A protein has these predicted regions:
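Flexible phosphate-sensing "switch/lid" loops adjacent to ATP/NTP-binding sites
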Residues: 1-333, 340-357, 364-365, 372-378, ...
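Active-site proximal loops enriched in glycine and acidic residues that flank catalytic Cys/His/Asp
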Residues: 5, 35, 177, 214, ...
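Cysteine-nucleophile active-site neighborhood
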Residues: 14, 18-22, 351-447, 452-455, ...
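Short beta-alpha connecting loops at secondary-structure transitions
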Residues: 51-60, 243-247, 360, 381-387, ...
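A generic structural signal for well-ordered coil/turn residues at beta-strand boundaries
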Residues: 206, 233, 297, 354, ...
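Acidic/polar loop patches that form or flank catalytic/metal-binding clefts of enzymes
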Residues: 209, 235, 271-275, 387-388, ...
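C-terminal and late-domain segments of enzyme folds
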Residues: 443-447, 451-568
Length: 568
């Protein structure tokens, strides 16, 4: 299944592809998505979040596009580096092979060598992208950009060749297009969509399915016109108009019969497991019913970030909070704030007026750091529910060192290499990587040993969890005892090394003050909300609605008064 955009980028190719993949997965088929990017970067790790949104870290440590997060959340399936390819990876692989002499003296060209490498990668994914490394029934290919872009032309050519080689019943192309609806005209116009699809057909690709993005449901008249000019029957044209939530898209596709059309096109009926489909639909149905149900409460959570002007920079945090609200029967409004504008305690108190809890997320560089520290101090001293993530974890340590231990110059060597009290310093294996930036951090899934009877254990219901990391700095080991004796409890650690990974204050000191060196937002799923976020939202609900403590759904996530005290 190949999904290619036309007219414009940003239409939701990942949402379409992952939603359709979910329907086939629900039927018992093994699906393997892949995103193919046209940029020359090896991965997304060094991209500016203002330009490209958040970096989504996979289990194996690859730093990828935020669309991989969409695939993982909708499919509820962990992906790996084989599910993400850039032009930089393709060219790098070819040049390495050329230097090794793998091409036997031939002149290396775009065709057949570059396109051949793309096809090889896709065939390998087809053979190993299923459960436990087995074959996949369907590979979903999302081509970044739009038809006609110079950067993705070799991908489209490779996919055209692959379709020819594998046969018409092995490949299905989807053109995702856009239907204009100018306010001055008051009607939908299909000309841009027609031209965009024509541009794709000029590349030698005949789409079998067309998905029409639009503000409102696409009229049958418009779909008939598009079908006539693109040789696609009406029953294979899908109106992908705006909906209240992206999680409604799979059900909309099912109602339109799109899954049945794909099974017919690719002759996959004999691989359907009806029993698994019923079970999967019941699970998603429960989630969908909660999604549309009226919420009993409403709270506001402040996101104290450095890239607050672009919500895509924190896309997974946005989704993790949404998941928690659904399962806690609460509407959660996010208030995005740029900490680089906060210069005093008064500034922080003013912007946090009416906020029921805060998240201090990750980031790099010194801009906005002092504002983050002020936010942590405000949360700690006013008992405002607090969740720190990555850099937010480190800022919680520095704030505690400055204001509880009394070391006013406590800092991180990232921001002040000459500080006399380096409470945060580089991980030992990072110090030898001077001048190398891309792909060198502590990346991917790592084990976290959770302290018994701690707040973290109460949330996770486990003494060993696996979370995803993306950092270069850690709590300086020789300060750990001083911090612990003063009341900052490290309840999550690396099982073998003195790397602190979760911190918290006792329930007697704070209802919810917890921070993680890892990125918990990356593992939140629609039907399995992330525990640390659940603890934060539950505490925010109790702060605003004390009577909600009698709600068992909320109370089970609260910081038990005996938990961290007993552990200490």
């Amino acid at each position: 299944m190949v999904v290619i955009g036309t007219v414009m980028s940003g239409l939701g190719k990942g949402i379409f592809s992952s939603s359709l993949a979910k329907l086939l997965k629900d039927k018992g088929l093994a699906v393997a998505p892949i995103k193919m990017e046209g940029y020359l970067n090896i991965d997304s790790g060094t991209l500016n979040p203002f330009r490209h949104g958040e970096v989504f870290v996979l289990e194996d440590g690859l730093e990828t596009d935020m669309d991989l997060g969409t695939y993982e959340r909708i499919l509820e399936q962990n992906l790996s580096r084989r599910n993400f390819v850039t032009a930089g990876q393709i060219y790098g692989d070819i040049l390495d092979r050329e230097r090794r002499g793998d091409f036997l003296g031939r002149d290396v060209q775009m065709i057949p060598h570059v396109t051949g490498t793309v096809k090889m990668h896709l065939r390998q994914l087809a053979m190993t992208g299923g459960p436990d490394g087995g074959p996949a029934d369907v590979v979903f290919v999302e081509v970044g950009g739009t038809a006609g872009d110079y950067e993705n032309g070799f991908y489209i050519e490779a996919l055209r060749e692959l379709a020819f080689e594998e046969g018409p019943e092995s490949t299905c192309f989807v053109a995702l297009t856009y239907i204009l609806e100018p306010a001055t005209l008051g009607e939908q116009k299909s000309k841009a969509a027609q031209l965009g699809i024509k541009r794709l057909m000029e590349c030698g690709v005949q789409p079998q399915v067309i998905a029409c993005r639009a503000t409102n449901p696409v009229t049958e008249k418009v779909m008939q016109k598009i079908g006539m000019f693109s040789n696609v029957p009406l029953n294979r044209i899908f109106s992908m108009h705006d909906r209240e939530s992206i999680y409604f898209i799979p059900d909309a596709m099912r109602e339109a019969g799109l899954d049945r059309e794909i099974l017919s096109l690719l002759q996959l009926h004999n691989r359907v497991n009806a029993g698994k489909e019923d079970q999967s639909r019941r699970k998603w149905s429960e989630f969908s019913s909660r999604l549309v149900a009226p919420r009993a409460h409403r709270v506001t959570i402040g996101v104290m970030g450095k890239y607050a002007s672009l919500r895509d920079a924190y896309a997974s945090i946005d989704k993790a909070v949404e998941h928690c609200g659904i399962w806690l029967n609460a509407s959660v409004d996010l208030k995005w704030m740029d900490t680089s504008t906060l210069e005093s305690k008064a500034d922080v108190a003013a912007v946090l007026q009416g906020v029921d809890g805060i998240i201090v997320p990750g980031g790099f560089g010194q801009r906005g750091v002092e504002g983050k520290i002020l936010c942590v101090e405000h949360a700690r001293t006013t008992r405002l529910p607090f969740l720190g993530i990555c850099l937010g974890f480190q800022m919680a340590v520095i704030e505690f060192a400055r204001n509880v231990l009394g070391l006013a110059d406590a800092n991180s060597t990232e921001f002040d290499p000459k500080t006399a009290h380096a409470f945060i310093s580089e991980l030992p294996d990072q110090k030898k990587l001077e001048g190398i930036v891309g792909g060198t951090m502590r990346l991917g899934a790592q084990d976290v040993a959770i302290e018994p009877r701690s707040f973290a254990e109460h949330l996770y219901k486990s003494n060993l969890v696996r979370e995803r990391f993306r950092h270069r700095y850690e709590v300086e080991p020789h300060y750990i005892d001083a911090l612990t004796k003063a009341g900052l409890h490290f309840s999550g650690r690396h099982p073998k090394h003195p790397i602190m990974q979760v911190l918290e204050l006792s329930a007697s000191e704070h209802p919810c003050f917890v921070a993680a060196q890892f990125h918990p937002e990356l593992t939140s799923r629609p039907t399995m909300p992330q525990p640390l976020f659940m603890g934060l939202i539950a505490a925010a609900l109790i702060r605003k609605y004390p009577q909600a403590a009698s709600d068992e759904l909320i109370a089970r996530w609260l910081n038990a008064p005996t938990a961290t005290a007993a552990a200490r």
